[in-house]
Amino acid sequence: MATAPATEKKAPAKKAAAPKAAAPKKAAAPKAAAPVGAATGRIAQVIGAVVDVQFTGELPAILNALETDNNGNRLVLEVAQHLGENTVRTIAMDATDGLTRGQPVRDTGAQISVPVGPQTLGRILNVIGEPIDERGPVNSDMTAPIHAKAPEFVDQSTEASILVTGIKVIDLIAPYAKGGKIGLFGGAGVGKTVLIQELINNIAKGHGGVSVFAGVGERTREGNDLYHEFLDAGVIAKDADGNPTPDGSKVALVFGQMNEPPGARARVALSGLTMAEYFRDQEGQDVLFFVDNIFRFTQAGSEVSALLGRIPSAVGYQPTLSTDMGALQERITSTTKGSITSVQAIYVPADDLTDPAPATSFAHLDATTTLSRAISELGIYPAVDPLDSTSRVLTPAIVGQEHYETARRVQETLQKYKSLQDIIAILGMDELSEEDKLVVARARKIQRFLSQPFHVAEVFTGIPGKFVPIEETVKSFKAVVDGEYDHLPEAAFYMVGGIDEAVAKAAKLAEEA
């Protein structure tokens, strides 16, 4: 498998690359050009996204990219299987409508490669690295194959430090690790995309390094909104004429949306990751890699799996589910050169966390943020379940003793309240002991205090977004579990930032009463 980090593209002489791109170019290895008179074949059959191609001479290798013309558009096919009788089975990266049997297909002699480097910043690309933002070609003279080996163990870094998000429930209960992998689990409509957009707002905008956003099988509208938000926030820079420019931009976007064929959705996460790896390995940067939604990567794999003739495994998923997931996730890691911190939204089919797709992702993650429908029904947003979310870095050695104890006491209070809910439902609050009544009152305040207004939701809610520093979060929750704010009404804790805002809101409520 090709593992070259980046390769020079044989192309007509162009303008010299910007001086700042010169340093990493030394590491780029020359790419073997597609052989002269490279193998050509003919389409034998087309079944949806899967195309069989028959060759007369040498067969292309597995994962090679083949090219054909489809009504004037370049269509890329990736070799998935050798069937015998000089036939290969391929997965199409775009719609196959209009293909005909007997149509010629050319072997490129290499894997699908995408542009990498500073010129990809501020651009929107598709799975095969073509720009889809109507702003002309990407002026990068470096490309990299989308399939690569994961870094060796000796090259990986194991330092643990916290990535502050400014979101109370996350920073307190399930903090994120720098250079770690984070999963946002949730069913349909509980707020995964809004949470990932808030994380982009809070982390990427203040982050000095580069971010890569891979939109995998999600709504085109959300991708469009995100692009315009980045433009407004200055994450994508503009030139003197007000047009987006790579110079000064901090984010590259790669989209393979819901309307794309499964081939594109199954590979677009790898295309985005390849761009992120370049910044990590060649420029030594700390990269943020956002994926929305990793479940669609699995779903696309299962769509083509049956067409490839594989026997389905549990719940109809592809038999190679954990291998496919591992091949992607093992590449998302921190090395001695730089780091990739990955935030992945993971759709949970029918709210069932034991479904093979989300369950396979769990094993790879450093922190899991589980979004609960029951909490969203209470109107508490972000609808993070504090008892079901976990983090590898929530240990006294990393977060400190005070933070660790506060988080555990908050969880303990909420767990006691959860166990008392059946009694309350049957007998009512009056049957509880005084001690239990106090636990319930505190737990309900904590529950509401874990809500927070988001910057990205400000246009819908009309409430200004809040970023809460981690020290203030710990101090506020410690005071609440210690009973310092038992005298404040529950409503004062809902949709505020720090504890000072809750006190001010309580005073305002008292005036209105």
Swiss-Prot record:
Classification of source organism: Bacteria, Pseudomonadati, Pseudomonadota, Alphaproteobacteria, Sphingomonadales
Subcellular location: Cell inner membrane
Residues holding ATP: 186-193
Annotated region (Disordered), positions in chain: 1-29
Oligomeric form and interacting partners: F-type ATPases have 2 components, CF(1) - the catalytic core - and CF(0) - the membrane proton channel. CF(1) has five subunits: alpha(3), beta(3), gamma(1), delta(1), epsilon(1). CF(0) has three main subunits: a(1), b(2) and c(9-12). The alpha and beta chains form an alternating ring which encloses part of the gamma chain. CF(1) is attached to CF(0) by a central stalk formed by the gamma and epsilon chains, while a peripheral stalk is formed by the delta and b chains.
Protein name: ATP synthase subunit beta
Biological role stated in the UniProt entry: Produces ATP from ADP in the presence of a proton gradient across the membrane. The catalytic sites are hosted primarily by the beta subunits.
Topology relative to the membrane: Peripheral membrane protein
Catalytic activity: ATP + H2O + 4 H(+)(in) = ADP + phosphate + 5 H(+)(out)
PANTHER family recorded: ATP SYNTHASE (PTHR15184), ATP SYNTHASE SUBUNIT BETA, MITOCHONDRIAL (PTHR15184:SF71)
Example GO molecular function: ATP binding
Organism of derivation: Sphingopyxis alaskensis (strain DSM 13593 / LMG 18877 / RB2256)
Keywords per UniProt: ATP synthesis, ATP-binding, Cell inner membrane, Cell membrane, CF(1), Hydrogen ion transport, Ion transport, Membrane, Nucleotide-binding, Translocase, Transport
Enzyme class: translocase
Domain of life: Bacteria
SUPFAM superfamilies linked: C-terminal domain of alpha and beta subunits of F1 ATP synthase, N-terminal domain of alpha and beta subunits of F1 ATP synthase, P-loop containing nucleoside triphosphate hydrolases
